[in-house]
Amino acid sequence: MKTRHHLFALVIALTGLMILSAQRAAAGEPTFNDFRPACFQKKIDVKTPGNRAAGLTDFARAFTLAFPSDVLTNALRARLDDPKNTRKDPNTLTLDPPHGYLKYNYSAEPGVWLELCFWTQPSGHRLVAVSMADTYNEDEEGLLLFYDYDPKTRSMKPFAAIRDEDFGRGVDGRIVELPRVGYDIRIYERGDRKSKPEIFKWDKGMHFDPQ
């Protein structure tokens, strides 16, 4: 029964990925690569009710609103706007506010997902990271983005000082794992999650150092 269950789950996952690809193709929607340039340039306003300090879901919702043309960001925003999941979203949302971590799996692992986490700076700013991946599409390079959130202006500005090149051989074609526990970023080779990852240690500021 376990074998049948796993096969059924795999079929469902692959079907979901095929639907996602078909939706993007049919609608002429952009891939990660299409809106990559804008991600590194666009300032994002973060709106919260009243004077409440911005948190994990506020950063995630602001990002999805800034880039509404992607199937993945649309799906995540719909889920965030429906916290009790009354629409029975079949995808998996992991919310861990105490650790400043969010992950939204569009389909079963490995597949398509968005991760977001943030680090609190001594200045009160937040370093916000967003990672988007599509492990089934070899043409997709994936995205790893960093933003500097200023609580005074309530905006996230792209933080260009951190570049792909700062992460060893870069992130293209590899799997980025943002930290749910701890502070450090791990990068794996695609298709080999059992291999030892490259670890990049947060310097308690706005940079990551290879270990």
Question: Where does each model-flagged region fall?
Answer:
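Short aromatic loop motif centered on NTY/YTY
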Residues: S155-Q211
